[in-house]
C-alpha cells in the first residue's frame, strides 16, 4: 500500500472522533466519519509504518443498522456525519469511544453514569454561520456550509434539519437577493469580493432572532432594501436584530472591525434555568440551548451542597455555568480570555440580580496567579485544547477540595485528568452529555475530589 493508492476498507471499529478503522494486509487503516459495519472506498492520504489513513470517496455498503438520511444535503455538506445512524446507536458509539480513551490512558472513570440525551435530535441549533461562495468554480452564488472533503466549495443548505424553518427562510431569502444583485463573494485568494458570511442566531425560550451580514469594505452597497426584505419575512420567531459587520481581516473567523446596527438591538436574550443571558453577534454560547440546560444542571448536581463555598469558573465564556452555580455558592469568580465575553458575563450577572459573581478578563494561566480567594470548588470548562499546563499547575496549587471538569474534547480531558490524579485528585464520577446529535462531538463531565 502506498500514498495515492485507492483501496476498499471494511470498518471494524471506531476511535474518537468518529474515526472508523479496519485492516488491510494487517495494517490498521483509518477513515474519518465512518462507522463499524460499513464498507468504504477511498484514496490513501497518509502511510506510516504503524497505520494509514484514507479519504473516503464512496460508501459501498451501509452498516446493517443504518437508516435513510433525513436531510437532502447529507453526504455533500460537511455539517453532519452520523445522520444515518439511529440515535440510540450514536449514543452507544460515543460512550464506547470515550470509555476507550479513558482505558487507553489508564484513567479511571469512577462511577460511570452513562450518557444523557439531547432533549431534541433535530432543529436543535441556535446559531449557524453560513459562508458565501459557489458550489463549482464560476457557478452561481451559494450560501451555506463547506462541502465535505473540499477546501472551497460551498453547498446551499436551505433544507438543513439541524435548524428550524426560520433559519432556512432567512438563508434562502438572503442568497436569492444577493444573486439578483450580482454582488461577488469574498475569495480568500486573491482576497477580493464583498459577501463573506451570514450569521443567524435564535434563542429557544424567547424565540428572538439576530441576523448578522458580514462583508468586506470593498464595495459600498446600500443595505436598506435587504433590511426591509428580512423585516418583511413571515417568521415564527421574533426578529430582534439585523447587524452589518464589516471585516477585511485575513482570518476566516468573523472579526468585527466595524459593526452597524441596521435594525433593532445588537443582542438577543436566552433563558437558561431561570436566568437570562444577553447574546451578542459574537458571544460564545452553547449552540444547543435545551442541551445546555441539561449540561449545566449536571454541573450543579455534581457540586452538591455549596452554601458558603467559593467557586472558581475557569474559561467561563459569558458566565453561564458560573451564574447557574451562583445560586448555590457564596461567591463565584470567573476568568475568561476574551474581554468582550467577560464584560458580557458581568452584565448578565447584573441583569440576573447576582451580586456574588465577578468575572475577570485575561489569560487563565496569568490571571489565576493574582486571585487571592481560596476556592472550595473549581469548575474547568476549557477549549478543545484542554487546560493550559501553566494554568493546571495553579489549579493544583489552590488545593481545592473539589474539581468539576466539563470537556468538549475527551482526548485532552484524559491527559489533564492523568496530571490531576498524580497530584492527589481522585475521580468520583463521570457522565457524558450529548449536546450535538448527528455529529461526532460529545461533552464529558467529571467530578474529582482531593484525597
Swiss-Prot record:
<keyword id="KW-0949">S-adenosyl-L-methionine</keyword>
<keyword id="KW-0808">Transferase</keyword>
<feature type="binding site">
    <location>
        <position position="381"/>
    </location>
    <ligand>
        <name>S-adenosyl-L-methionine</name>
    </ligand>
</feature>
<dbReference type="InterPro" id="IPR012340">
    <property type="entry name" value="NA-bd_OB-fold"/>
</dbReference>
<feature type="binding site">
    <location>
        <position position="286"/>
    </location>
    <ligand>
        <name>S-adenosyl-L-methionine</name>
    </ligand>
</feature>
<keyword id="KW-0004">4Fe-4S</keyword>
<dbReference type="GO" id="GO:0070041">
    <property type="term" value="F:rRNA (uridine-C5-)-methyltransferase activity"/>
</dbReference>
<dbReference type="InterPro" id="IPR002792">
    <property type="entry name" value="TRAM_dom"/>
</dbReference>
<dbReference type="InterPro" id="IPR010280">
    <property type="entry name" value="U5_MeTrfase_fam"/>
</dbReference>
<keyword id="KW-0408">Iron</keyword>
<keyword id="KW-0479">Metal-binding</keyword>
<feature type="binding site">
    <location>
        <position position="160"/>
    </location>
    <ligand>
        <name>[4Fe-4S] cluster</name>
    </ligand>
</feature>
<comment type="similarity">
    <text>Belongs to the class I-like SAM-binding methyltransferase superfamily. RNA M5U methyltransferase family.</text>
</comment>
<feature type="domain" description="TRAM">
    <location>
        <begin position="1"/>
        <end position="58"/>
    </location>
</feature>
<feature type="binding site">
    <location>
        <position position="77"/>
    </location>
    <ligand>
        <name>[4Fe-4S] cluster</name>
    </ligand>
</feature>
<feature type="binding site">
    <location>
        <position position="336"/>
    </location>
    <ligand>
        <name>S-adenosyl-L-methionine</name>
    </ligand>
</feature>
<feature type="active site" description="Nucleophile">
    <location>
        <position position="408"/>
    </location>
</feature>
<feature type="binding site">
    <location>
        <position position="315"/>
    </location>
    <ligand>
        <name>S-adenosyl-L-methionine</name>
    </ligand>
</feature>
<dbReference type="InterPro" id="IPR029063">
    <property type="entry name" value="SAM-dependent_MTases_sf"/>
</dbReference>
<dbReference type="InterPro" id="IPR030390">
    <property type="entry name" value="MeTrfase_TrmA_AS"/>
</dbReference>
<feature type="binding site">
    <location>
        <position position="80"/>
    </location>
    <ligand>
        <name>[4Fe-4S] cluster</name>
    </ligand>
</feature>
<dbReference type="GO" id="GO:0046872">
    <property type="term" value="F:metal ion binding"/>
</dbReference>
<feature type="binding site">
    <location>
        <position position="71"/>
    </location>
    <ligand>
        <name>[4Fe-4S] cluster</name>
    </ligand>
</feature>
<keyword id="KW-0411">Iron-sulfur</keyword>
<dbReference type="Pfam" id="PF05958">
    <property type="entry name" value="tRNA_U5-meth_tr"/>
</dbReference>
<protein>
    <recommendedName>
        <fullName>Uncharacterized RNA methyltransferase CPE2114</fullName>
        <ecNumber>2.1.1.-</ecNumber>
    </recommendedName>
</protein>
<keyword id="KW-0489">Methyltransferase</keyword>
<dbReference type="GO" id="GO:0051539">
    <property type="term" value="F:4 iron, 4 sulfur cluster binding"/>
</dbReference>
<dbReference type="GO" id="GO:0070475">
    <property type="term" value="P:rRNA base methylation"/>
</dbReference>
Amino acid at each position: 500500500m502506498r500514498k495515492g493508492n485507492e483501496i476498499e476498507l471494511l470498518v471494524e471499529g471506531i476511535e474518537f472522533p468518529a474515526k472508523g478503522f479496519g485492516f488491510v494486509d494487517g495494517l490498521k487503516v483509518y477513515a474519518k466519519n465512518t462507522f463499524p459495519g460499513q464498507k468504504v472506498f477511498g484514496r490513501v492520504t497518509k502511510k506510516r509504518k504503524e497505520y494509514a489513513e484514507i479519504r473516503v470517496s464512496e460508501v459501498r455498503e451501509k452498516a446493517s443498522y443504518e437508516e435513510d438520511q433525513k436531510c437532502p444535503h447529507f453526504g455533500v455538506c460537511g455539517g453532519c456525519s452520523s445522520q444515518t445512524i439511529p440515535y440510540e446507536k450514536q449514543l452507544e458509539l460515543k460512550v464506547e469511544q470515550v470509555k476507550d480513551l479513558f482505558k487507553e490512558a489508564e484513567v479511571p472513570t469512577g462511577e460511570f453514569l452513562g450518557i444523557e440525551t439531547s432533549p431534541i435530535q433535530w432543529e436543535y441549533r441556535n446559531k449557524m454561520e453560513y459562508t458565501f461562495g459557489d458550489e463549482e468554480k464560476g457557478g452561481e452564488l451559494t450560501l451555506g456550509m463547506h462541502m465535505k472533503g473540499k477546501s472551497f466549495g460551498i453547498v446551499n443548505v436551505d433544507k438543513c434539519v439541524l435548524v428550524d424553518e426560520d433559519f432556512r427562510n432567512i438563508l434562502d431569502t438572503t442568497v436569492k437577493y444577493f444573486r439578483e444583485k450580482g454582488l461577488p463573494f469574498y475569495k480568500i485568494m486573491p482576497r477580493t469580493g464583498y459577501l463573506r458570511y451570514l450569521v443567524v442566531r435564535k434563542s429557544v425560550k424567547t424565540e428572538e432572532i439576530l441576523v448578522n451580514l458580514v462583508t468586506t469594505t470593498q464595495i459600498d452597497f446600500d443595505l436598506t432594501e435587504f433590511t426591509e426584505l428580512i423585516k418583511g419575512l413571515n417568521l415564527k420567531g421574533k426578529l430582534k436584530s439585523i447587524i452589518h459587520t464589516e471585516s477585511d481581516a485575513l482570518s476566516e473567523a468573523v472579526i468585527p472591525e466595524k459593526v452597524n446596527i441596521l435594525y433593532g438591538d445588537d443582542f438577543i436574550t436566552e433563558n437558561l434555568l431561570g436566568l437570562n443571558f444577553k447574546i451578542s453577534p459574537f458571544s460564545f454560547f452553547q449552540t444547543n440551548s435545551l442541551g445546555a440546560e441539561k449540561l449545566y444542571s449536571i454541573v450543579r448536581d455534581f457540586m452538591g451542597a455549596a452554601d458558603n463555598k467559593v467557586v472558581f469558573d475557569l474559561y467561563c465564556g459569558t458566565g453561564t455555568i458560573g451564574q447557574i452555580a451562583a445560586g448555590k455558592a457564596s461567591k463565584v469568580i470567573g476568568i475568561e480570555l476574551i474581554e468582550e465575553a467577560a464584560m458580557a458575563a458581568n452584565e448578565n450577572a447584573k441583569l440576573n440580580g447576582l451580586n456574588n459573581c465577578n468575572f475577570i478578563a485575561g489569560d487563565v494561566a496569568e490571571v489565576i496567579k493574582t486571585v487571592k480567594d481560596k476556592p472550595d470548588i473549581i469548575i474547568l470548562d476549557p477549549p478543545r485544547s484542554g487546560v493550559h499546563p501553566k494554568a493546571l499547575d495553579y489549579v493544583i496549587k489552590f488545593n481545592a477540595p473539589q474539581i468539576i471538569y466539563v470537556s468538549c474534547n475527551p482526548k485532552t480531558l484524559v491527559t489533564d485528568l492523568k496530571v490531576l490524579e498524580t497530584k492527589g485528585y481522585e475521580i468520583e464520577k463521570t457522565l457524558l452529555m450529548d449536546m450535538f446529535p448527528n455529529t461526532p462531538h460529545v461533552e464529558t463531565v467529571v467530578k474529582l475530589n482531593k484525597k
